Amino acid sequence: MVTIRADEISNIIRERIQHYTKKINILNTGTVLQVGDGIVRIYGLDEVMAGELIEFEEGTKGIALNLESKNVGVVLMGDGLRIKEGGSVKATGRIAQVPVGDAYLGRVINALATPIDGRGEILSSEFRLIDSPAPGILSRRSIYEPLQTGLIAIDSMIPIGRGQRELIIGDRQTGKTAVATDTILNQQSQNIICVYVAIGQKASSVAQVVTTLQEKGALQYTIVVAEMADSAATLQYLAPYTGAALAEYFMYKERHTLIIYDDLSKQAQAYRQMSLLLRRPPGREAYPGDVFYLHSRLLERAAKLSSKLGEGSMTALPIVETQSGDVSAYIPTNVISITDGQIFLSADLFNAGLRPAINVGISVSRVGSAAQIKAMKQVASKLKLELAQFAELEAFAQFASDLDQASQNLLARGQRLRELLKQSQSAPLTTAEQIMSIYAGINGYLDSLELGQIGKFLRELSDYLKVNKPRFQEIINSTKTFTEEAEAILKDTIPSEKDRFLREGKI
């Protein structure tokens, strides 16, 4: 018979009591009332925060956007096909955040920072809030460094600085994405991290951009965030904020970044869809009242940081699509008022063969020459003036039958200047090449050439300078000034090269 030892039992009980830890898990839970169209109505969740992450029992996540007296409106970050009425929901106590890090360079990811390029997982230990606050006034400094796009029309007349927000606006099929991707390609030697955010695009269009970046060796310093046209509205709405969080990570690491949002019209449409399904009151063009705040809090995150924070920068190039050139619509006017200038792409110019189809007359950079090197300022001011005079005279010449010789010369010069602004896609020019082209145009060296010959002549002249007069590029790159020596090289080279070009053309 087993003897019961009271002291042993009491020791065991005492030991258990000593090692007992009182652990109570308090969960903020709720019940699914209604689900459909990417929106879930939930009863309960009494202490949920606006913007808090919500987790459903089958694993789908959502964001609490509408906090009402009787229920909570949640937008789903996924299809939510397995969510049922009466299902359990819990609040996570966290605001949406994404992993960030150098490992994301060269990868294609979605709005939740999950890779979609089939190249395996991305390991990262750091996280940033998707919707983090913009730097304050004291955290910034004024813009003074140029961000070269490689496009002669932009770098000379609509200069962009590091930390600026410059809108690219135009109708569909006018080359907006081409301007943005060419700018990414031009950063290869500039040590700038690029983030390209595709919102609601066709998968084939995004694949084309990724292929171009890969072929040109630009994907290694670029992160592509893509949410296609068939993605949930919530993910299309979140994609730009994810891109901004990744760019901010590098900015605060004292690096220079460039972010392209392609395009914010589609983000606004996704947000409108979410808001209408959440029964928020519609305003102008059925957009909700806070659609301005949607874009302002995103674009204000672009900044040139102060010297105390390391002088990193985040330059934003948002893209907005217009309908039939109407820039007075709601979203275009909103984004124009938030940004530091706009590059307007015209369908008429595009169809007339001027590509990139930049309408220099109504495009503007509010940072201006502060974002230009001295060498470019020296040659670009005359180019602006002559093109403005040409545009005025061209409009007048449509009604006048006979023009005096001076006016005819001005028209001929203007046509040649407009011709030198033409560029092939994915062929950005260096600053030295741009200065050479502008100098040749404004000083009349191109006046005796046919319009069709100008592009070929400038390419040959550039090749000749690179091989035989490398000193010209050295001067521009090192001094950032168009010195007398640099001008003497051009004065000596252009006439002799033009004579050779014309002789060869006649043979």
Swiss-Prot record:
* Signal sequence segment: none
Q: Where in the cell is it found?
A: Plastid membrane
Q: What is the protein's membrane topology class? A: Peripheral membrane protein
Reactions performed catalytically:
ATP + H2O + 4 H(+)(in) = ADP + phosphate + 5 H(+)(out)
Where does it primarily localize? Answer: plastid
Q: Name one GO molecular function term.
A: ADP binding
EC number, as in UniProt: 7.1.2.2
Q: List the disulfide bonds.
A: none
PANTHER family associated with the record: ATP SYNTHASE SUBUNIT ALPHA, MITOCHONDRIAL
* The name this protein goes by in its record: ATP synthase subunit alpha, plastid
What organism, scientifically named, is this protein from?
Cuscuta obtusiflora
